[in-house]
Design a protein with these regions (language model features):
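General structural signal for secondary-structure boundaries
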Residues: 4, 67-69, 214
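Short glycine-rich loop/turn motifs that provide flexible caps or phosphate-binding loops at active sites
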Residues: 5-6, 81-82, 218-220
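Buried, small/hydrophobic-residue-enriched core segments of structured protein domains
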Residues: 9, 16-190, 200-204, 210, ...
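Acidic side chains
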Residues: 135, 169, 216, 229, ...
Length: 256
């Protein structure tokens, strides 16, 4: 089933047809509506977020805020259908064979003696997918400079910088992304990715785009996995027709 947004209302474009004896058709009603309504809701929300991002990659980051494990995992599936390039939900990745993507947490940084050591250790572990979270202490005075230091050391050691960059998770994302982009470019890393998270939705992403932000990758969690501004999908299951059936018999009395 596919969905679209018309005006301010979510609408179903295609229909599911169930042909069955009435009792059997009624038995599956609740299951069908539960599955279709929830996942159509999340897929629709995701498509709006992806549209606002204007072609940038959207990662589903919502498991911790979803309404339970099942909603988080099936919601991740729906988000992939809606246009996400990956999910942080490892179980969803295993069950549905979709890309698992993510970075590290602030707690990773704080568990090391200093930010540089945390970055260096992470880069040693994941050299081909090295996105460093730079806002634990001070984004522009500490985080970005330490990330640049690690990237420089990787390049000098001959380690291919195949996919690398930084993630912003707080503050004025438009301003910080512009400053960080300038610092990365001047250090010789024009292809470094700038990713962002922090309670994003399609409206905030659109606003950041209008402000000329330098973010090209987005991690969207709470608003996507819960469809926070529109928390239910009004799909219905209705009886459309009842077909009469003929009775065939070889009993002459019945024929009369």
């Amino acid at each position: 089933i596919t969905t679209r947004l018309v005006g301010s209302e979510m609408c179903i474009r295609d229909r599911i047809k169930v042909i069955a004896p009435i009792m059997e058709a009624q038995l599956v009603e609740t299951a069908i509506l539960n599955i279709i309504n929830h996942q159509s809701l999340i897929a629709t929300k995701t498509s709006r977020v992806c549209f606002a991002a204007r072609g940038d990659g959207i990662m589903e980051f919502g498991l911790r805020r979803a309404q339970g494990p099942d909603a988080g995992t099936l919601g991740a599936r729906a988000a992939m259908i809606g246009g996400c390039v990956g999910t942080s939900n490892v179980l969803a990745g295993q069950l549905f064979d979709v890309p698992v993507k993510g970075t590290h947490a602030h707690s990773w940084i704080m568990s090391f003696p200093d930010e540089y050591t945390a970055f260096k250790t992470y880069a040693d572990m994941y050299p081909s997918a090295c996105i460093l979270l730079v806002d634990t202490y001070d984004t522009l005075k500490s985080g970005v400079p330490n990330a640049i230091r690690v990237f420089t050391e990787m390049r000098e050691a001959g380690i291919p910088l195949t996919f690398y960059g930084i993630r912003l998770d707080s503050g004025d994302l438009a301003y910080l992304s512009k400053k960080a982009r300038k610092m990365l470019d001047e250090a010789g890393f024009p292809d470094a990715v700038i990713s962002a998270s922090n309670d994003l939705d399609e409206y905030l992403i659109d606003s950041l785009k209008v402000q000329g932000c330098k973010i090209t990758s987005w991690g969207v969690g709470t608003h996507l996995i819960t469809s926070k501004d529109w928390p239910s999908f009004g799909g219905v299951y209705k009886l459309a027709a009842i077909q009469d059936c003929l009775l065939y018999t070889s009993d002459a009395a019945d024929e009369l």
